[in-house]
């Protein structure tokens, strides 16, 4: 199921935690794997258990075994997530109409503060107490380009496809950005995007 659909159903049920998921693309499996969300709530907050297939065996992990933390989880590396049970124990249940109004406002703000071009979303995790986008901006990263990939001039933590960008272009550009930020701030930006394959 798409994460957007899960978010919509949760909002309709009055789950305030789902406000943190608004506008996040992808499927529910990916959202669980990276514990998608924002300061308003992460998917891991409402997970009761997850069923997955790992090395040919079906296993069910309870909430604590999932090991949810900022942009990560504890699922086996090659696990395929097949089912999840969500339960709103700690989140506030509100009038769904009010939540939908708030969700639409959040979406509108996102559309104004994030690039419209194709991208993989936020490239780096926010370091503790700071924002990756701010650090990249301060390190003069906005507008840097490799091939068809460019650091967005709207939000520096997005690498957008300006036409014909390859995965190698994106990874090369992101590495340049990491090096700039580390030189200027002595902060190593950690990938938020999961890379699969050889980019050499």
Regions found by a protein language model. Name each.
Residues 9-15, 34-44:
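A glycine- and small-aliphatic-rich helix-loop capping segment at beta-alpha/alpha-beta transitions
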Residues 16, 46, 64-66:
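Short beta-strand or tight-loop elements
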Residues 24-31, 38, 122, 148, ...:
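Gly/Ser/Thr-rich helix-start
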Residues 32-34, 65:
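Short Pro/Gly-enriched beta-strand edge/turn motifs at strand-loop
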């Amino acid at each position: 199921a798409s994460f957007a659909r899960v978010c919509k159903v949760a909002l309709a049920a009055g789950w305030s935690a789902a406000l943190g998921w608004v506008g996040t693309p992808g499927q529910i499996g990916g959202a669980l794997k990276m514990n998608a969300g924002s300061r308003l709530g992460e998917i891991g907050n409402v997970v009761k258990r997850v069923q997955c297939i790992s090395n040919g065996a079906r296993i069910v992990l309870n909430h604590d075994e999932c090991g949810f933390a900022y942009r990560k989880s504890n699922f086996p590396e090659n696990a395929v997530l097949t089912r999840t049970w969500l339960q709103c124990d700690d989140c506030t249940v509100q009038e769904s109409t009010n939540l939908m109004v708030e969700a639409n406002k959040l979406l509108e703000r996102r559309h104004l503060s994030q690039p419209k071009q194709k991208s993989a979303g936020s490239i780096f995790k926010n370091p503790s107490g700071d924002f990756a986008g701010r650090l990249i901006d301060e390190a003069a990263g906005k507008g840097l380009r490799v091939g068809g990939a460019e650091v967005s001039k709207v939000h520096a933590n997005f690498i957008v496809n300006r036409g014909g960008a390859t995965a190698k272009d994106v990874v090369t550009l992101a590495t340049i950005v990491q090096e700039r930020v580390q030189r200027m701030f002595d902060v190593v930006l950690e990938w938020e995007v999961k890379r699969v394959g050889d980019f050499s």
